């Protein structure tokens, strides 16, 4: 069927931009992607915010201070020092423990043929034992002296 001769043929409706009043002659702010392709985000800058200025940070300098403690050498005698646990000036308390020299002396005496338990004499001699140093105030272990 054809349209009546007195009426014009209907045309396509106007586009959205024409209806709303958007000027289609202005260029788009971002490139228009082609059909079938996704924009990858390259070359697109985020919008600039106005109003508050960007805060400027001042560089912070950090200075490290090293406090070197005097080196305390532990021997088989009490040592005067500052306790690292209670920070008091102390003279260490000694405790003798069987160590490598004690056991080697015992083994050597055993190989030489000491009979009737004479090879156990090194366990009674403090001069052959290792020495542990303790704080007399807080009983903290502050050091040790190994004979071997």
UniProtKB/Swiss-Prot annotation:
It is a peripheral membrane protein. GO terms for biological process: cytokine production; regulation of cytokine production; sexual reproduction. Residues 62-147 form the LITAF domain. InterPro entries: LITAF, LITAF_fam. Residues 103-123 are annotated as: Membrane-binding amphipathic helix. One of its GO terms (cellular component) is lysosomal membrane. One of its GO terms (molecular function) is zinc ion binding. Disulfide bonds: none annotated. Zn(2+) binds at residues 83, 86, 135, 138. PROSITE patterns: LITAF (PS51837). Keywords: Cell membrane, Cytoplasm, DNA-binding, Endosome, Golgi apparatus, Lysosome, Membrane, Metal-binding, Nucleus, Transcription, Transcription regulation, Zinc. A motif (PPxY motif) lies at residues 13-16. Signal peptide: none annotated. It comes from the Eukaryota. Pfam families: zf-LITAF-like (PF10601). It is found in: Cytoplasm; Nucleus; Lysosome membrane; Early endosome membrane. Residues 35-56 are annotated as: Disordered. Plays a role in endosomal protein trafficking and in targeting proteins for lysosomal degradation. May also contribute to the regulation of gene expression in the nucleus. Binds DNA (in vitro) and may play a synergistic role in the nucleus in regulating the expression of numerous cytokines. The LITAF domain is stabilized by a bound zinc ion. The LITAF domain contains an amphipathic helix that mediates interaction with lipid membranes. Belongs to the CDIP1/LITAF family. PANTHER family: LIPOPOLYSACCHARIDE-INDUCED TUMOR NECROSIS FACTOR-ALPHA FACTOR, LIPOPOLYSACCHARIDE-INDUCED TUMOR NECROSIS FACTOR-ALPHA FACTOR HOMOLOG. This is Lipopolysaccharide-induced tumor necrosis factor-alpha factor homolog. The gene is LITAF.
């Amino acid at each position: 069927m054809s349209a009546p001769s007195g009426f014009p043929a209907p045309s396509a409706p106007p586009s959205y931009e024409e209806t709303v009043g958007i000027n289609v002659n202005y260029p788009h702010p971002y490139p228009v992607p082609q059909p079938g392709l996704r924009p990858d985000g390259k070359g697109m800058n985020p919008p600039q915010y106005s109003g508050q200025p960007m805060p400027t940070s001042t560089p912070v300098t950090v200075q490290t201070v090293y406090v070197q403690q005097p080196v305390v050498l532990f021997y088989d005698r009490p040592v005067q020092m500052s306790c690292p646990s209670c920070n008091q000036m102390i003279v260490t308390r000694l405790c003798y423990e069987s160590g490598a020299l004690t056991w080697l002396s015992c083994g050597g005496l055993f190989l030489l043929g000491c009979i009737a338990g004479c090879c156990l004499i090194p366990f009674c001699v403090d001069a052959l034992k290792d020495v542990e140093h303790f704080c007399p105030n807080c009983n903290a272990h502050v050091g040790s002296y190994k004979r071997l």
